[in-house]
């Protein structure tokens, strides 16, 4: 009887549907924290940091323009921005639109300021982020 009970228990154990969590480590930063760090690196014109925060290839979709770059640093021209009066950018709002374990979407409203601290542009952008080895990276913007 004990043998039958033991065999039944072993058999039933194999029938239990168990979910195994293979990726138990959470990303170091949230998607919104990643976008905030992106803006900090942008304000420092730190192309190396920007390339680390973003994924390659990187894309921009702006209106009818669709651009894909080997890396984010290829998409930005800080000298041209400065020639147009840009000094720094400031986040007005960040909103997490969507998040699952692999992807997320963040909406950012921001302003660009000149050296005189006057707003020269206010705009919005949506960013697609991908979870690469427990690090959120910005894959593209639109």
Regions picked out by a protein language model, each given a short descriptive name:
Residues 4-12:
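Sec-dependent N-terminal signal peptides
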Residues 75-118:
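Surface-exposed, charged secondary-structure patches
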Residues 58-69, 84:
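A short gly/proline-enriched turn/hairpin at secondary-structure junctions
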Residues 15-48, 52, 60:
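Short, low-complexity N-terminal intrinsically disordered segments enriched in polar/charged residues
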Residues 20, 120-142:
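Short beta-strand edge/turn micro-motifs at domain boundaries
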Residues 54, 64-65, 108-112, 142:
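A mature extracytoplasmic/lumenal domain signature
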Residues 38, 49-51, 58, 74, ...:
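Hydrophobic pocket/interface hotspot
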């Amino acid at each position: 009887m004990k043998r039958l009970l033991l065999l039944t228990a072993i058999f039933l154990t194999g029938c239990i549907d168990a979910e195994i969590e293979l990726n138990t480590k959470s990303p170091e930063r949230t998607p919104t924290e990643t976008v905030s760090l992106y803006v900090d690196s942008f304000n420092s014109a730190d192309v190396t940091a920007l390339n680390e925060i973003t994924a390659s290839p990187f894309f921009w979709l702006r209106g009818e323009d669709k651009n894909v770059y080997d890396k984010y640093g290829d998409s930005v021209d800080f000298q041209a921005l400065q020639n147009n009066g840009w000094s720094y950018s400031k986040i007005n709002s960040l909103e997490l639109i969507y998040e699952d374990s692999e992807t997320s979407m963040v909406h950012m409203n921001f302003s660009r300021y000149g050296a005189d601290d006057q707003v020269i542009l206010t705009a919005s952008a949506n960013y697609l982020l991908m979870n690469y080895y427990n690090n959120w990276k910005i894959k593209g913007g639109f």
